[in-house]
Regions:
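Alpha-helical substrate-recognition element adjacent to the catalytic core
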Residues: 2-112, 116-121
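C-terminal cap/substrate-recognition subdomain and adjoining C-terminal extension
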Residues: 79-93, 100-239
Length: 239
């Protein structure tokens, strides 16, 4: 039977070269307050949703044109578009799952001719008082490290006989990887996988990911990650 792979990719710091969400608040928010909020999030003192609400409150009198110019100045990984083509060619469904915001993801994807990519994220609008107003359509209180519950998107978009691949780099991915068969990690996510002894493949760009997936696809026998299967089963039972 032909192997079916479902690919799930983080956005900030994985597709984009910088964490755009964090960079926006560091540039336009109150620096001291922003630093304090991020420290609390990384030390699990507040949830992802609480951090986003506080970060948005730290920004006053935002200039929309300045924000757009700033977003436009941040590049994506130059190998990502080729990776998207690779997934299409090999009929592997690709989902972008981000704890960031649709406001800048839409802008980046339009710029890079990637508007057809399916993605899930939090929502962000600029109101009449030039304030950032976030909303969280995919919030799950079990997913405290991500206001957009990435775990649920993975479980809802993959079946028992399909292999799940996750590609990410950061804090919002820590809970997510526990439910995936194959993990590509860098930066903070890589450190987390090492500490928690979760098997992963290190990567620097999507060309390296492509080469490894080719290897996985060529294996005659490919095992799903047992601990991930147990975790997924727990979710089904608890529901």
């Amino acid at each position: 039977m032909e192997k079916v792979f479902k690919i799930f990719v983080d956005f900030d710091g994985t597709i984009s070269k910088q964490d755009i969400g964090e960079a926006i608040f560091r540039k336009f928010g109150n620096p001291e307050r922003v630093e304090n909020i991020i420290e609390k999030l990384l030390s699990d003192k507040i949830t992802a949703k609480e951090s986003w609400l506080s970060l948005c409150e730290s920004v006053e009198n935002l200039d929309k044109n300045e924000l757009n110019e700033f977003i436009d100045s941040i590049d994506i990984d130059e190998t990502f578009c080729n990776f998207v083509d690779y997934c299409k060619k090999n009929e592997m469904e690709l989902f972008v799952i981000s704890d960031g915001f649709n406001y800048y993801i839409d802008r980046v994807f339009e710029r890079e001719n990637l508007k057809d990519l399916k993605y899930y994220s939090n929502k962000l609008v600029i109101d009449s008082n030039n304030k950032l107003v976030p909303s969280f359509p995919y919030l799950d209180h079990n997913c405290t490290s991500s206001a957009n519950c990435k775990r649920n998107h993975i479980i809802n978009n993959s079946g028992e006989d399909e292999y799940t691949i996750f590609i990410g780099d950061g804090n919002s991915d820590k809970y997510t990887v526990q439910f995936c068969d194959f993990i590509f990690a860098k930066d903070d996510l890589l450190k987390y996988c090492e500490i928690e002894r979760i098997t992963y493949f290190p990567f620097n760009n999507f060309n390296e990911v492509t080469a490894k997936i080719d290897e996985l696809r060529s294996r005659k026998r490919l095992k799903k990650r047992y601990q991930a299967e147990l975790k997924r089963r727990e979710v089904y039972i608890n529901e």
